[in-house]
Amino acid sequence: MNGDVIHVAAGSYVPSVPLTGMKTALDNTFEIHSNFSMIGGYPADAAEGAVADPVANETILDGDHAVCHVVAVTAAKMNGMKASLDGFTIKNGSSQFGSVGSTTIGGVKFYQSYGAGIFIGNATVDILNCKIVDNTDIRMGAIRVDAGAEALFDNCVVADNATKSTTTYNCGGLWADGAKLLRINNCTFSNNKASGVAPCIYVFGDTGGKTNVLISNTTISGNSVNPEHATLNGGGIYVRENGNLVIVNSTVYGNHSGKGGGIAVYGTAAKPSKAVIVSCTIAGNTTVTAGNGAGLQQAAVGGAIEVYNTLISGNTTDGAADDVAWFKDASYKVANSIIGGTVYNADGMAVAGAAFDPASMLSPLGDNGGATKTCVLLGDANPARQYGMSASELKILGETLDPAFGEAVSAIDQTGASRTGKTVIGAVVK
């Protein structure tokens, strides 16, 4: 019922009831059909007053490699209400080859072949302190966030998900299509794979229209197109038609694809896309095809990019620097940022006498405090410590963007350290 709270003890649970409108065992799912909360992580022998601890008391929603969606969120939107899922491991969802059945709930088609871990329809939902791991899908992600959805993923891990086939099926991690607003905060996306484009995060309003995504304080690492393919884009994030991304205080590291190993942006005149990148570190990403932006790729004239207070360096193709590829005549802006070895001021002009060396001035990905792994700056004479934006400038910028972020985000770095009194480029001020 709406408003209910369900407390779940540690253990492994397999769904046994089909999704509304479906009939087969393949369609069995844990359906969040109303705006209630489910909280996992309680001891198996919990007594009155027990406190949830999902690390000590793992609570698993297990598809057992036999269901299309482990969790389906179908709750109708209601003013002042939302569904929530807190403290669960969601694993072993397995959408099937040849599965083309669907049911329509709240105006959204729940296809069997989409969203093996979680399928979010036209609902308002918080996914908190969850692990979404080891799900396999034909296409469209271990997580599917569909048209009209308003969803938050906070303090979650999305890892080791994959598409099944060596045929080019897209997106092993999360696919947002038509989301009214998807927010991702304090999350880790790692080691997701796809045989097509966007092995990790796909922001593509393919059928659902404009898709709004805000990513903050998140690390996206080690995701890859597999098997390797020279022309497939977006190892970490791929923003396509109708996609609208703002990413802030985040690290995109060690991802791999044919082109645009870290982030790729593609749009058309009829269906433009946009990515705004603020206070991020994009490093250690690789591509197969040289000259196509191992760190950041602008793949078409309809894909606009704005880069602020961001470090993009140490990205390579076959060992050679290949940080950014701009598309001819496309719209882009760079301010208070570093690309490769060049430092840019607020007007997008190179700073004379300032140079950045990723080998000696930036650490590999590691544990540096905070909820996620990051890279830290090395050396006191590092230009990334000098030419960035102030906390007040970042506050003003964040409030003007769409989706916007407030001072709670702009005033700190990815680890939670204060930006006050500093003008540091990148995700971490240390």
Descriptions of predicted regions:
Residues G3-V5, A9-A10, S16-S37, A47-P54, ...:
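Predominantly extracellular beta-rich ligand-binding scaffolds that present long acidic/polar faces
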Residues A9-G11, G41-Y42, D64:
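Active-site-proximal beta-strand/loop segments in catalytic clefts of secreted hydrolases
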Residues S16-S37, A46-G87, K91-T124, I138, ...:
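Extracellular beta-strand-rich solenoid/capping regions of secreted or surface-exposed proteins
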Residues H65-A75, G348-K430:
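C-terminal accessory segments
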Residues G98-Q112, S165-T166, D206-G209, N226-A230, ...:
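Intrinsically disordered, low-complexity Ser/Thr- and acidic-rich flexible linkers and loops
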Residues A162-T163, G172-W175, F189:
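Solenoidal tandem-repeat scaffolds enriched in leucines and small polar residues
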